[in-house]
Amino acid sequence: MWYQGESDTSEAEGKVYLALLKKLIGLWRKDLRNENLPFIVVQICDLNNRADEGWRAIQCCQAKAETEIPQVKTVTSRDVCSHESIHPNDKRALALKTARAYFALTERAAEK
């Protein structure tokens, strides 16, 4: 699971984020000797409706990861945060969403 903030990002970093995320996932899968290792990306919620370009670019890349990298699911935390804090008030709800994403990946892999 990758659960990383975006508060210190720039638009330039957003342009390379997806490529770096692909590389990171690939390296972890190689190191763990499992090319199909399920990987969950958790998007941090919007902080006070923050909408700067760097933040949005990272969130966009995180959403694309699900379609561009095999065995990856993206989970958003927007619906479990208050928008006054990037940390969810209901951590259990986010944990359940993450678990569902993981099981969706592992069930799909088992069907192949």
Which stretches of residues belong to each language-model region?
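Cell-envelope and extracellular/periplasmic
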Residues: 1-112
